[in-house]
């Protein structure tokens, strides 16, 4: 069907249904079911729905801009793409399990919660902004930007084979970050603000040439790596670096209010300054190529260290 403007209460375009427009197009109504269907425009596409948008195994594509406003969006194994700016806003959940949301320009996503698990892909070639609540990026999920990436979320899960990454500056403000065997990195700079929440980086990687870690509570870096080419500081209530790596090519400053555990772990930098209430470095290595300072107010265990 060739169309330019479509305004009805309920739109059903399921199972190989096709809607195509050569011009700028507006789709408005209560709900849209594009499961297995195709909605394609050669210019801008604006979708405005009071209720749900279902794009399960469907295709929504614009050669111009793409704007979606809906109560909720389910794009499981579906695709939303635009050559221009892409803006998605949902009052409820945005589900992109195994799906693809991509823009050749800027990408802006606002939702109450976000499920990008099961190899879901969210990708912007220019500045990318994601604002959500609970964010599930496990099971191979990918949130990537070829430009800057700004992420604001509540609890973030970034599991095995999953990535949150950018070519330029990456800024993340979250209330908790659970990254078991996932990767969080930038080719330029990374600022991670936990807002006094927990950081779990078991078997994970956090890396950037310039790294800033803010407002950490407890940090679990067992078998993980937190590293930077430049100087960085890690301030936390407790830090477990057992079998983990904390590495800086310049200076590394650790300020741990209570317990620092680094059993068989590595802490290494050009200049290293460590302060904690308790330290267990059994089988671990604290290494500096220059100045080394270790201050412990309480018990020190350094068996085989």
Each predicted region: which residue ranges?
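Short stretches within intrinsically disordered, low-complexity N-terminal or propeptide regions
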Residues: 26, 72, 87, 105, ...
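Short, small-residue-biased leader/transition segments that mark boundaries at the very start
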Residues: 1-2
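Beta-strand-dominated lipid-handling architectures at cellular/organellar boundaries
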Residues: 150, 178, 191, 198, ...
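Hydrophobic lipid-interacting interfaces of membrane-associated proteins
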Residues: 9-11, 30-32, 50-52, 71-73, ...
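Short, T/G/N/S-enriched strand-turn elements that build extracellular solenoid repeat scaffolds
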Residues: 14-20, 34-40, 55-61, 75-81, ...
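Transmembrane beta-barrel architecture of outer membranes
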Residues: 22-24, 42-44, 63-65, 83, ...
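Long, compositionally biased tandem-repeat segments
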Residues: 6, 27, 47, 68, ...
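Long, intrinsically disordered low-complexity repeat domains
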Residues: 125, 146, 195, 230, ...
